[in-house]
Amino acid sequence: FHCAWPANRPGRRPAGAALFGAFPLAYSVVLEALYLPLILMLVGLIFRGVAFEFRFKARANKRHIWDKAFIWGSLVATFFQGVALGAFIEGFKVVDRKFVGGTLDWLTPFTLFSGLGLIVAYSLLGCTWLIMKTEGSLQKQMHDIARPLALVLLAVIGVVSLWTPIAYPQIAERWFSMPNLVWFMPVPILVLVTFYGLLRAVARDAHYTPFLLTLVLIFLGYSGLGISLWPNIIPPSISIWDAAAPPQSQGFMLVGTLFILPFILGYTYWSYYVFRGKVTHEDGYH
């Protein structure tokens, strides 16, 4: 975790700038429609960052405060990220390229369930990461809770997969119409196969396989989302081409991306390489 923490921060700012520069219409609509959940997500991330840094400087009798701040910051950030994803699936009310919905349009049972579902998904991801990076009693504890978490996540995916086409006919039409059906059909099959492999890996106390298979599950989930919405970047009707910036702006951003991206990837690779292997009691954050 101590290598992933500084390594994942440089990608957030370029990602936001890329959305603003390459798809300004998407940036303006999404930001206006999801202003409150995105702000709360950022507040959670701020709590995480502050707690992570200050815990190691606090006295022993005060560290529990920063532990709780980190836990709640993580939960809030993850929950509202899931809420935003759920609202994205539901779509936005757009007229003449402007958001015309209400401030709380994002607050629905589906989005709240999506927020809870993402907490389960990221909990499993963190659990399997600890299986991969730790040893001893902590690793055994994570092995014990990985299977229940995986089964809960499977139930969440099942509920979302049924709820989405029933509640949103436009998505059902995308799922079950050609050629989208051809692209979408492998996703649920691969999800079930991956879950089976994950449960088998956890049962035999594997170290690395559970985390890798959980990554595959997360990738399949976002792949299903992409297939469900493609080619729209602002559901239900604004396509990626309608929201794109002029070619000159995209060309300018491409030059900057080609320059910056290798540094980010190189730094991330180097961080993971340096901190490869198991974390022991003697290791610490400095």
Regions found by a protein language model. Give the residues of each.
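Juxtamembrane helix-loop boundaries in multi-pass membrane proteins
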Residues: 1-13, 38, 64-78, 140-151, ...
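Short, membrane-exposed interhelical loops at transmembrane-helix boundaries
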Residues: 234-253
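Transmembrane alpha-helical segments of integral membrane proteins
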Residues: 49-56, 196, 227-240
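Divalent metal-coordination and catalytic microenvironments
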Residues: 125, 229, 271
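Membrane-interface helix-loop-helix modules in multi-pass inner-membrane proteins
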Residues: 4-74, 95, 171-182
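Long, contiguous internal "core" modules enriched in hydrophobic/ aromatic residues
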Residues: 54-207
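Membrane-interface capping segments at transmembrane-helix boundaries
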Residues: 199-205, 266-282
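...captures the hydrophobic TM-helix bundle architecture rather than a specific catalytic motif
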Residues: 12-17, 37-44, 48, 70-86, ...
